[in-house]
C-alpha cells in the first residue's frame, strides 16, 4: 500500500525543502517507508533552484552548492580567489560571503548543472540578504521529472 505526502527533505542539509506529492509506502506494521527515487536528479533540481534564488545565499546553501559540485572548501576557495578557511567561515556563518564571490559560486553551480542560472547583471541584484527564509518546493509526483515549484510568500 502507498500514499502521497508532502515530505520535508532534511537529509539534503538545507532544512527547508518540501517534496510535494512524494509516494511513500506503508509496511506491514502500518509505518511509512520513505524512499527518495532518482536522488541525483532531485539534487540537480535543487542545485539550480538554490543557485537561482532571488536573495543572498545562506551558509547552508553555500555548503550545499559546494558539495553538490563535488568541491572541497579549498577547491571552492581557489575557484573564487579565496582560501579554504574563508569558505569554511562562510559555511559556518562566521562571516558573510562577498557579492563577487557569491556571483562566481552561483555561475559555477549553474555551469555544473549545464544550465545558465541567470545573467551577471541579474545575479548582482540577487545577492542581498532576504527578510525571511522561503522553502524550496519540489514537485515529487514524477521522480523521473522533478521540478521546482514557486514558494508562496509567508
Regions from the PLM with identified roles:
Residues 55-71:
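Short, amphipathic alpha-helical "recognition" segments used to contact nucleic acids or chromatin
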Residues 68, 108-112:
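Generic structural signal for hydrophobic core residues of well-folded globular domains
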Amino acid at each position: 500500500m502507498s500514499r502521497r505526502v508532502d515530505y520535508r527533505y532534511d537529509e539534503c542539509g538545507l532544512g527547508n525543502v518540501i517534496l510535494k506529492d512524494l509516494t511513500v509506502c506503508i509496511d506491514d506494521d502500518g509505518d511509512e517507508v520513505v524512499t527518495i527515487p532518482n536522488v541525483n536528479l532531485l539534487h540537480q533540481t535543487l542545485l539550480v533552484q538554490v543557485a537561482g534564488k532571488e536573495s543572498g545565499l545562506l551558509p547552508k546553501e553555500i555548503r550545499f552548492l559546494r558539495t553538490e559540485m563535488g568541491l572541497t572548501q579549498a577547491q571552492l576557495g581557489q575557484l573564487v580567489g579565496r582560501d579554504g578557511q574563508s569558505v569554511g567561515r562562510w559555511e559556518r556563518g562566521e562571516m558573510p560571503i562577498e557579492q563577487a564571490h557569491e556571483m562566481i559560486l552561483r555561475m559555477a553551480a549553474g555551469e555544473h548543472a549545464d544550465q545558465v542560472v541567470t545573467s551577471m547583471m541579474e545575479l548582482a541584484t540577487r545577492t542581498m540578504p532576504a527578510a525571511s527564509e522561503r522553502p524550496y518546493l519540489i514537485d515529487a509526483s514524477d521522480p523521473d521529472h522533478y521540478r521546482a515549484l514557486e514558494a508562496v510568500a509567508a
